[in-house]
Each structure stands twice: as C-alpha cells, then as structure tokens.
C-alpha cells in the first residue's frame, strides 16, 4: 500500500483545516508573507533560485505566522529530526532544524499560492509547473509495483493514455509502473491539486486590499508568462467581445482544464473540443443535424476564410495542445485539420457530439467530462453549443435592456 498524496499535499490538508474560517486569519497571514509568496511564485516559474535571503529574520516572521494559525512548528521540526540527531554537534542540529523549517514554510507558501491562484485563470499553468518540479519527490516514494486499487485511484481521474491498465503488466493484484513512474508521479500531483483547487475555489476570498494587491501582482507577473490565458476569450458570430470561460458548458471547460494542467484527454474528447471551439469561434449556430434530421456536411472553408483557419490552428497548438503530455506538433496539426474538414481527409467538419452521446459514450472517454449543471438540465440544451448560444443571447438581451433604460433616462427614446 502506498500513500497517494505526497507529504506536502498532506501538509496542505492540515492547512486547509486551519484556514477553514478563512476570514479570521487569512488576510493577516497574506500581509505578513506577501513578498515571500511572490518570490515563491517566481521560483516555481523559473525566475528565482531562492525565496530566502536572510533566513534568521525570515524564520522569525514565519514563527509568528505559525503561531497565528496555531501550528506547532517546533514540535513538527522535532518529529522530523532523525532520532539519533542528539549525537550531532549543536551547530549541525541547528542547520538541520533550519532546513526542515524552510521546507515547512515553503509548503505554507505553496498552499497560500494555491488558494490565490485557484481564483485566477492561471491555476492550470501553476499545476503543470508544480507537478514538474515536485515529481522527483513523489518518484522516490513510489515502488515499482503498486496495488491495482491504488493505481486505479489515480488512473480513473487521469486521461493519460499511458495509464490505461491494459497497457501495463498486472500480476497478483499489483501493477508494474516501472516504465511509467515519472508520468504516474506527475499525475498523482496533478489530479490531487486539481481536486484541491476545485474545493478551495468554492470558498470566497476576503474582500480586502491585501488580497486584491496580491492577485494583481500575480496577474501582472503571469500574464506574459502564460500565453494561453486568452484561450478563454474567443469571439463568436454576431457577438462583439470576448466570451468568458463560464459561458462554455462544463464538459468543454473540463477538457480545457485537463489539457491546460498537463493532462491528456481521450481522442474523442479532444476531437469534440476542437470542433466545438472552431464552431464557437466562427458559427456557434452550427449543429450536426438540420431541422429535417439530415446530417449537415460542411467544411472549414464554408464558415471561415483560409487565413482565419490557419490562425485558429496555430493559436490552438501554441496556446493549448503544447501542454498535452503526448504532444506531437505535426500529428496535432493534421488531426485538427482533419477534424474541422480543412485540406486533408474527407474534407468535412466532424461535428461535436450531442449531449446524449456524451452521457452514453460507449467508452469514448466523454462521459468523464459530462457533469451537468442547472443550465445543462434545461430541455432545450441538447448540444454543447446550445449552452454557449443561450449565454450569448442572455448577455445580448441584458445589454439591449441596459441600452433602452439608458435611452429612457436620457430622454432619447421617445
């Protein structure tokens, strides 16, 4: 039996309990650790080698922080010191104590970053980076063979092709993960962090200046680093302006989050996403069947110019698919062109599936992403693009109403 969460994630669970009533001490902790949070963010994204400059005074600051959240850091350090540590000289012991404290402090900073970033468009990018830098720690804990049930706990929440059980050796209830240990380690971190982020996202951040300042500073730093942030801002026919991510259905958002955080959705899920995204951008009213029930056969050039299509493909590859674990640019380009019916293959757009086919997908890997919300349950939402169109129309209606009210107020509508 192995522990699926590494030690730092266990730390996060403890911090989660300590910050349950987030308004009590969260802002004060942020205020005291603000510069360290930004330093740690820069370290994770490769722009800083350390978060500590004057360790003695900095540990004093964090001793106060741990006291605020009722965390016995000295007791924790004592537990982590080797049992025979008393044999060493005082100087050596002190050095080891400082190293342990630095690790505990870094865990706290990571947790604070997760809280903040889960309320921004950059959380997926953070998860991908974090899984990459922490994988070694997890790999060291992983044996070559693990219980099939422990394997399934992670594999069932991952869409990485290499984690399909039929591809691996299974003997006496144990899976041999020797060849895929690095991938498995990253997925342990990724799926658990995504789950943690989702839970934290449900809690509102305190509405105060220190939170706003930190979020602005994080955004200013990451907006140029994370090129695909604008992936959530596509434009649609008859609608001027960017479409917010929440206007897209949960299934599409789920696939997007998986890709951006370094996951690898199934072939069918990627195909549905690509075609949905293309139609959302150029013709969100397009559906697989016309009103007479006939299949709608169109190619990409029927709804967009070649220049627009080429730009769409380039952006999708650069902003999105480069994050996928099994990325191959040449294959990905061909695959996108084939799915939207552009220059290769049968020359017809392969439509995004109707909702009923997501729910009963016959093993295509679509049902995993089908998590209906209240809007999905409305009778007229039978296709993912219906969800988008509903939100576009709702917004346009609201804008028209605002305009009429303004004209009435100014006396221009007589």
From Swiss-Prot:
Keywords: 4Fe-4S, DNA replication, Iron, Iron-sulfur, Metal-binding, Primosome. Binds 1 [4Fe-4S] cluster. Its cofactor is [4Fe-4S] cluster. [4Fe-4S] cluster binds at residues 251, 352, 370, 376. InterPro entries: DNA_primase_lsu_euk/arc, DNA_primase_lsu_PriL. One of its GO terms (cellular component) is primosome complex. GO terms for biological process: DNA replication, synthesis of primer. One of its GO terms (molecular function) is 4 iron, 4 sulfur cluster binding. It holds the Pfam family DNA_primase_lrg. Regulatory subunit of DNA primase, an RNA polymerase that catalyzes the synthesis of short RNA molecules used as primers for DNA polymerase during DNA replication. Stabilizes and modulates the activity of the small subunit, increasing the rate of DNA synthesis, and conferring RNA synthesis capability. The DNA polymerase activity may enable DNA primase to also catalyze primer extension after primer synthesis. May also play a role in DNA repair. Belongs to the eukaryotic-type primase large subunit family. Heterodimer of a small subunit (PriS) and a large subunit (PriL). This is DNA primase large subunit PriL. It comes from Methanocaldococcus jannaschii (strain ATCC 43067 / DSM 2661 / JAL-1 / JCM 10045 / NBRC 100440) (Methanococcus jannaschii).
